[in-house]
């Protein structure tokens, strides 16, 4: 029925909106926690900049187009589910960043964190491109702009929540 299709569209949009909020929270929270991370791991400002910006952004920007192409040729929903799992897993691994000792060789906590932030960027690259395509598939031209605007509001909601949660975590717990 038309009512069922409308509910399905709106439910899908709500799920995409919530996923986008979490996507943005993850990007913003690290900015609030960076001084705690810097102190805990003994990072310098260059390392901090690489971890918060470069490591994430290079992979995110580089992988966005290939991931979008995969989403267009396979299952958009499937790409989003896999991407969500990747970025969630790597986000959790960020909190476990410690030096790794392999015999006499040591991988520094900075390198571990850099690699995990790159993994987060890889996962998050599969968020918005398939979401935009799914919204375009679900909503007819006359309603598509509003649907995309609602989805995009997740950016601002995620930023607000990311800064709030980051501040709270920094005071109440620790960055890990």
Regions inferred by a protein language model and the residue ranges of each:
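Extracytoplasmic
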Residues: 11-45
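Residue-level signature of mid-helix packing/kink "hotspots" within the transmembrane helices
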Residues: 28, 56-65, 125, 159-160
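Extracellular/periplasmic helix-loop-helix junction of adjacent transmembrane segments
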Residues: 33-62, 107-111
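Membrane-interface helix termini in secondary transporters
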Residues: 36, 65-69, 168
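Conserved MFS/SLC helix-loop-helix module at the cytosolic interface between two early adjacent transmembrane helices
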Residues: 62-105
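Cytoplasmic helix-loop-helix junction between adjacent transmembrane helices
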Residues: 112, 116-156
